[in-house]
Curated annotation (Swiss-Prot):
Its main location: cytoplasm. It is found in: Cytoplasm. Keywords: Aminoacyl-tRNA synthetase, ATP-binding, Cytoplasm, Ligase, Metal-binding, Nucleotide-binding, Phosphoprotein, Protein biosynthesis, Zinc. This is Cysteine--tRNA ligase. Pfam families: DALR_2, tRNA-synt_1e. Disulfide bonds: none annotated. Gene3D superfamilies: Cysteine-tRNA ligase, C-terminal anti-codon recognition domain (1.20.120.1910), HUPs (3.40.50.620). Its cofactor is Zn(2+).
């Protein structure tokens, strides 16, 4: 079964054939680290971490690069407002980013390059563009000469005449054409800066990714990915810079994930309708948030609400409960062989259907449907009077494998009997104090861990589900 990817560049699904057999070069645009990320910012890391995991499952060696923009107008503004320097703020929010996305099940990239650690190659890249006639200096700034690049607009599918019609030169800009964009910005008084052939300054946003992608992955990469808001102008400008310099295709497959909406309106810091990952993972299990995000195809928008999150949690718990029941039945199962082939054949069908979904442009929504199907089928098998260890192990292994591909975990560490008794005692005390909210919370927490409570006249009994 071959993998097909929807390529933004061609607006169609294409068979995925990497440049090098069994190797994938993948670049995902990372955050500007001036604040905590919101759940809209967290969607690309989760989506493309899942893409990476599936490619690795299929046997590819994935070189996964995701950058940090650690110098930028937003960082400079934050530094001025807080009375701190830019590196201090950047370091703080790089660490916060790692805490958030690690909680959400994302693996670290092969490389996480930072702009400030790659200034030499960025300046060199700009100088080469100037030498080739694709860029020009203007009073300390350097701009890309868009009209010199014939393919401009091909990613966003916009004719250059239409783009130019809607563009304008802002006050203070020193460019020749409204579509020209900054590669290097002259430093203003009091701003952080680096020395360059054009004077003191810092790079523009777009050039950073082109330079770092080239350094770590080469002139041509297999997959370039990010949120759909980056397609224009950021990714369009990356293509122009990179292909003008090398004369080669910059990226062969372009992937873009959809927005997250709050009440049908795009979530963004500028609108103030955002939910920080830093906050929501204190309220909800990060694994639930990831499962919720993957329940929708990555190119589709997600309308976020706590009601939908709770509904998704119910489904996730059904799968986890089935898994827990399978694990507990393992002990009492036998080496029975009757009818094994029938059940094992059905299990294999679920595996095939899961892979077919993922091969179809990483359709995690359909893949998760197969997780529900596995759980439902396993529950039917558990109704059998006698169960086979071989079949039970096949269900368990399949659920573990599929969850791992999606970056999800199936179970928390099992509670010891003494820990359960302690929690029951706390619940009894809470009920005596008429703290029914705490009592219910303890009961629900135990239920999530597959511990069922039964209140009787003789006291509270418990059993593993």
């Amino acid at each position: 079964m071959t993998i097909h990817i929807y390529n933004t560049l061609t607006r169609q699904k294409e068979e995925f054939v990497p440049l090098e057999e069994n190797k994938v070069k993948m670049y995902v645009c990372g955050p500007t680290v001036y604040n905590y990320i919101h759940i809209g910012n967290a969607r690309p890391p989760m989506v493309f971490d899942t893409v990476r995991r599936y490619l690795e499952y299929k046997g590819y060696d994935v070189q996964y690069v995701s950058n940090f923009t650690d110098v930028d107008d937003k960082l400079i503004k934050a530094a001025n407002e807080l009375g701190e320097d830019v590196p201090t703020i950047a370091d703080r929010f790089v660490e916060a980013y790692f805490e958030d996305v690690t909680a959400l099940g994302c693996k670290h990239a092969t490389v996480h390059p930072r702009v400030t650690e790659n200034m030499d190659i960025i300046i060199e890249f700009i100088q080469e563009l100037v030498n080739k006639g694709y860029a020009y200096e203007s009073e300390g700034d350097v701009y890309f000469k868009t009209k010199e690049f014939e393919g401009y607009g091909k990613l966003s599918h916009q004719p250059i005449a239409d783009l130019r019609h809607g563009a304008r030169i802002e006050v203070g800009e020193k460019k020749q054409d409204p579509l020209d964009f900054a590669l290097w910005k002259a430093a203003k008084e009091g701003e952080i800066f680096w020395e360059s052939p054009w004077g003191q300054g810092r790079p523009g946003w777009h050039i950073e990714c082109s330079a770092m992608a080239r350094k770590y992955l080469g002139d041509t990469i297999d997959i370039h990915a990010g949120g759909q808001d980056l397609a224009f102008p950021h990714h369009e400008n990356e293509i122009a810079q990179s292909e003008a310099l090398t004369g080669k295709t910059f990226a062969r497959y372009w992937m873009h994930n959809g927005y997250i909406n709050i009440n049908n309106e795009k979530m963004s810091k500028s609108l103030g309708n955002f939910i920080l990952v830093h906050d929501i993972i204190k309220q909800y299990d990060p694994q639930l948030i990831r499962f919720f995000m993957l329940s929708v195809h990555y190119r589709h928008p997600i309308n976020f609400s706590e009601e939908l999150l709770q509904s998704t949690n119910n489904g996730l718990e059904r799968i986890k409960t089935a898994y827990g029941n399978l694990k507990h039945r393992m002990e009492s199962s036998t080496d029975l062989t009757d009818h094994n082939e029938k059940w094992l054949a059905e299990i294999e069908k679920f595996q095939t259907a899961f892979e077919e979904a993922m091969n179809d442009d990483f359709n995690t929504a359909n893949a998760i449907t197969e997780l529900y199907n596995v759980a439902n089928h396993a529950n039917q098998y558990l109704l059998e009077e006698h169960t086979s260890k071989v079949v039970i192990e096949a269900y368990v292994k399949q659920l573990e494998t599929l969850f791992d591909i999606l970056g999800l975990e199936l179970s928390k560490e099992e509670l010891l009997d003494e820990e359960i008794e302690e929690l029951i005692q706390k619940r009894i005390e809470a009920r005596k104090n008429r703290d029914f909210a705490l009592s219910d919370q303890i009961r629900d927490d135990l239920k999530e861990r597959n511990i069922i409570l039964e209140d009787t006249a003789q006291g509270t009994r418990w059993k593993r589900g």
